[in-house]
Amino acid sequence: MFREATDDDMVRLRDLERAANEAALAHVFPPDRYPFPADDVLARWALVLADPGAVTLVLDDRWQESLVAYATYDDHSLRHLAVHPDYWGEGLATVAIETALHAMDVRGSTSATLWCLKANHRARRLYDFLGWRMTGERRPAPWTPHPVEVEYTRLIVASDR
């Protein structure tokens, strides 16, 4: 199902991020005022894919022309998550999160964190449903107009590792 991303996926990662953001976050980043920063996002994906501590999993569409979903994680955090809007409601975000949490568990982690835009109501409902809890920490997002991000944490149920 999911596979590990390669440098060949960089543009498709950016394109999926754009599609998901434009559908879910237009109220935060109105495109007429804050156009999607395609070049900056592409540069960030280059850094993410080059980071030896991070793993990015992707799910191809059935024609392997575009990505349906991605999740990036490290030993202790879920860094990036997106599902193409055409596939919302199919449980792919849950599968991606659970896959990342399992990998963190195997690496010896007992808890995980993530940051989410406070105004990303759809994502926050999912995190709440999956047992993530807000820590009370906040920070400005790196992208203009720098909306507030909130931190979540979740215990990882120990396995046999």
Q: Which positions does each model-derived feature cover?
A:
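A short beta-loop-alpha structural element at the N-terminal edge
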Residues: 1-15
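Conserved GNAT-fold acetyl-CoA-binding loop/helix
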Residues: 18-45
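A short helix-loop-beta-strand connector motif used in the catalytic cores of GNAT acetyltransferases and
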Residues: 42-58, 77
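Conserved beta-hairpin
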Residues: 53-69
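Conserved beta-strand in the GNAT
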Residues: 65-77, 82
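Conserved acetyl-CoA pyrophosphate-binding loop and the N-cap/start of the following alpha-helix
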Residues: 87, 91-99
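Conserved beta-strand-loop-alpha-helix junction that forms the acyl-donor binding cleft
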Residues: 88, 114-124, 140-147
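Conserved GNAT acetyl-CoA-binding A-motif
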Residues: 104-115
